[in-house]
Amino acid sequence: MAAVQMDPELAKRLFFEGATVVILNMPKGTEFGIDYNSWEVGPKFRGVKMIPPGIHFLHYSSVDKANPKEVGPRMGFFLSLHQRGLTVLRWSTLREEVDLSPAPESEVEAMRANLQELDQFLGPYPYATLKKWISLTNFISEATVEKLQPENRQICAFSDVLPVLSMKHTKDRVGQNLPRCGIECKSYQEGLARLPEMKPRAGTEIRFSELPTQMFPEGATPAEITKHSMDLSYALETVLNKQFPSSPQDVLGELQFAFVCFLLGNVYEAFEHWKRLLNLLCRSEAAMMKHHTLYINLISILYHQLGEIPADFFVDIVSQDNFLTSTLQVFFSSACSIAVDATLRKKAEKFQAHLTKKFRWDFAAEPEDCAPVVVELPEGIEMG
């Protein structure tokens, strides 16, 4: 880890007040990082010191000893660190990952008594990126992490999956109407159909809130279905009441958690959840009137998140549609209206101007959502 220039008095205070994470036996050459910083581990590396208290994301990629250029998928985990706290972890050679099992208290205390001698093997937390990290995680609480992280706490760029059915024998394939192994595929689609259905290994999946696929209540009339398909407030309130009953603001913590898992953990499923959750928030006009503080904070979150991703990242390769501009276009048409809270309206107008100037995105055109909406009615309901 490269040396960081820091005022001696500040360094002394941080050494005694900051948290320390010790990671024993991490192999030389491993790509290791904390929050917005990453390094290649050297032979003397034992961890990170002077870490500010709060939520942090530690991530790493193992390296093939025979071919150091071969880097494994990124893995990571969240830690909630406290003032003067000491966390002791170990590298598992067998699993090639950090073992998150808590170290015995006696070992932790022995390590604490030896911190002065261990200091030379600990890299200092890079404070230059602390403000950026806080801006991306200020709504992620310890409770958010406990709720969303996988049961095994390891967040992996590639899902650990298993087949839904083992199908070890030919009779198992016949039972699923699948052709015998060895029979040549006649088309690409047939080849896809032969692939086994997969599911995440138990305990490895990020536990995101389930988002509704039906945006209207049971028994809704055709007019109500159309209304709830244009304004998703009913669906959003369903999520807030079920998942965040005591504090609707906590949905913003989940939005940030998903973004960090994608940005730093390289988890594509987290990006897809971020898009779906953002779409639900941005297309809920009635909810903006009720939860204006939540939406004021949402704008601040998006301001910092969008600064981390290239402008063309959200453009669909096939259709060339930009998910973000179309979603925010609907958001601004509601948030900039006279009916909403004045503070929210002013902040939305400033944010819109900022995005237009920075990314040259056009929010002036009428959004497609203003066109007539075609909705599929539930079975048994007919238009009057």
Swiss-Prot record:
One of its GO terms (biological process) is spliceosomal tri-snRNP complex assembly. GO terms for cellular component: spliceosomal complex; U5 snRNP. InterPro entries: AAR2 (IPR007946), AAR2_C (IPR033648), AAR2_C_sf (IPR038514), Aar2_N (IPR033647), AAR2_N_sf (IPR038516). Pfam families: AAR2, AAR2_1st. The modification N-acetylalanine is found at residue 2. Keywords: Acetylation, mRNA processing, mRNA splicing, Spliceosome. The keyword Acetylation applies. Belongs to the AAR2 family. Interacts with PRPF8 (via RNase H homology domain). Component of a U5 snRNP complex that contains PRPF8. Component of the U5 snRNP complex that is required for spliceosome assembly and for pre-mRNA splicing. This is Protein AAR2 homolog. It comes from Homo sapiens. The gene is AAR2.
